[in-house]
């Protein structure tokens, strides 16, 4: 199973680095920071579907 460690999040500012991740909501997140902030906002209901665009 594919996982991302989001224990250091949420963070107030994300870099513009582009390394897309596909969330379980079928939305593409630009990088780990954006994805992990969304995970934090979802109270853990959002998970990683796979690396790369959805």
From Swiss-Prot:
Record-linked Pfam families: Kazal_1 (PF00050)
Domain Kazal-like: 4-54
GO MF annotation: an example: serine-type endopeptidase inhibitor activity
Cellular component, GO annotation: extracellular region
Bridged cysteine pairs (disulfide): 6-36, 14-33, 22-54
Site keyed Reactive bond 3: positions: 16-17
Stored InterPro entries: Kazal-type_SerProtInhib, Kazal_dom, Kazal_dom_sf, Prot_inh_Kazal-m
Keywords: Disulfide bond, Glycoprotein, Protease inhibitor, Repeat, Secreted, Serine protease inhibitor
Location(s) in or outside the cell: Secreted
Transmembrane spans: none
Domain notes per entry: Avian ovomucoid consists of three homologous, tandem Kazal family inhibitory domains.
Protein name: Ovomucoid
Organism, as annotated: Guira guira (Guira cuckoo)
């Amino acid at each position: 199973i594919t996982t991302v460690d989001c224990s250091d999040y949420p963070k107030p500012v994300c870099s513009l680095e582009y390394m897309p991740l596909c969330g379980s909501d079928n939305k593409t997140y630009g990088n780990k920071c954006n994805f992990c902030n969304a995970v934090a906002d979802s109270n853990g209901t959002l998970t990683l579907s796979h690396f790369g665009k959805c």
